[in-house]
Design a protein with these regions (language model features):
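Hydrophobic faces of well-ordered beta-strands that scaffold small-molecule active sites
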Residues: 15-17, 46-48, 75-79, 104-106
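Glycine-rich, proline-tolerant flexible connector loops at the mouths of alpha/beta enzymes
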Residues: 22, 44-61, 111-122
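N-terminal amphipathic alpha-helix/helix-capping segment at the start of soluble metabolic enzymes
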Residues: 1-17
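Active-site mouth loops of central-metabolism enzymes
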Residues: 17-30, 76-87
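Metabolite-binding pocket within alpha/beta catalytic cores that recognizes anionic/polar moieties
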Residues: 57-95, 102
Length: 140
């Protein structure tokens, strides 16, 4: 469900959680145990950050999908666009949709160390409307 709708319908204060996914998949079991302990607080939604330059992008997808399926959290995936191609962003949005993730927080993001970004050719990353349009059947 669209988080904006949830907030509007709620009409009172609520909790939300932002998770930074562990880089090491060996730490995921402890991470999910922590999420399980937080579940009784009934957050209105959870968000999962997204590493720039590929550092935790796939982890975000897996973790946000698991939180939605296992704990029935309404989830929002962060999407950092700096350094990503239009094709990659489109594919990532589709993968989120395929995993039932209806909410995305699209951010420019910080330039990863060692990368030089030409903002004139990267202008599309600042306005994702036309990129995400094909995947907008969900609330992305």
């Amino acid at each position: 469900m669209n988080i904006g709708q949830l907030i509007a319908e709620r009409g009172k204060p609520f909790y939300s959680f932002e998770f930074f996914p562990p880089k090491d998949p060996d730490q995921w079991p402890d991470f999910f145990k922590m999420a399980e302990r937080l579940a009784p607080l009934e957050p209105l939604f959870t968000s999962v950050t997204y590493g720039a330059g590929g550092s935790s992008q796939d982890a975000t997808l897996e973790i946000v999908s698991h939180l939605k399926k296992e704990f029935q959290f309404e989830t929002m995936a962060h999407l950092t666009c700096v350094g990503a191609t239009q094709d990659y962003i489109t594919q990532y949005l589709q993968r989120l949709r395929d995993n039932g993730v209806d909410n995305v927080l699209a951010l420019r993001g910080d330039i990863p160390k060692g990368q030089d970004i030409d903002w004139e050719t990267a202008e599309f990353r600042l306005s994702l409307i036309h990129i995400s349009e094909p995947t907008r059947q969900a609330e992305i």
